[in-house]
């Protein structure tokens, strides 16, 4: 079956779950409210500008995971998903996912945001396969605060996707035959590799790149489109 790849933040979601999660942690008192929020905003601006140091960001984002018991993190995450993420789903995203599902495609969310935050979002959207940045866990399920494996960011998305395909071999499920939907300049490396790149509510850099390449540009937020 053909691959249908979807970025998550600002693509299927009308917002950024990673930034929102770190903001949420500050609001519930899990981290220093001012320092953490300011650093979170700085990293987000670097991400938007295409200059984010993903390893530095992972150290920042994974530190709170190691500082609190998993049971408490799970409780916070449930509240976060219910109150902030459900309303963040882009209005036309469920229909797009349904169209690919009905076509028999293999749906994959591929995101730089860590798996702890994004697994319940993928489940909520009914997407079976998630490729995300991984926070290291101990055998008891508690987090160490460290990154494990290749961050699923920029060129790292290509490497992680290749790993996924090696683990899920399918003659039709190749990168060259895949569709990929994204909003971000950071995903241009993978967009260049797939057979059907689609810019979704793109940032200015991706919008210009898509125009130059003749790629489709769509909105999952504009319900009148």
Per-range role (PLM):
Residues 18-21, 58, 139-146:
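Acidic/polar active-site rim loop that often engages polyanionic ligands
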């Amino acid at each position: 079956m053909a691959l249908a790849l979807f970025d998550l933040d600002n693509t299927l979601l009308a917002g950024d779950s990673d930034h929102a999660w770190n903001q949420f942690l500050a609001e519930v008192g899990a981290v220093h409210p001012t320092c953490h929020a300011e650093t979170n905003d700085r990293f987000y601006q670097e991400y938007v500008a295409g200059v984010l140091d993903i390893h530095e960001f992972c150290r920042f984002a994974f530190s709170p995971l190691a500082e609190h018991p998993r049971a408490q993190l799970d409780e916070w995450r449930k509240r976060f998903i219910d109150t902030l993420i459900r309303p963040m789903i882009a209005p036309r995203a469920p229909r797009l996912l349904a169209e690919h599902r009905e076509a028999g495609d293999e749906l994959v969310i591929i995101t730089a945001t860590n798996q702890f935050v994004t697994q319940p979002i993928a489940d909520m959207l009914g997407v079976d396969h998630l490729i995300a940045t991984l926070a290291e866990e101990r055998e008891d399920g508690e987090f160490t605060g460290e990154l494990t494996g290749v961050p699923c960011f920029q060129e790292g998305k290509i490497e992680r996707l290749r790993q996924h395909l090696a683990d899920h071999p399918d003659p039709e499920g190749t990168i060259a035959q895949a569709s990929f939907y994204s909003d971000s300049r950071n995903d241009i490396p993978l967009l260049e590799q797939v057979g059907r790149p689609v810019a979704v509510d793109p940032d200015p850099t991706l919008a210009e790149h898509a125009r130059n390449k003749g790629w489709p540009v769509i909105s999952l937020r504009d319900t009148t489109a």
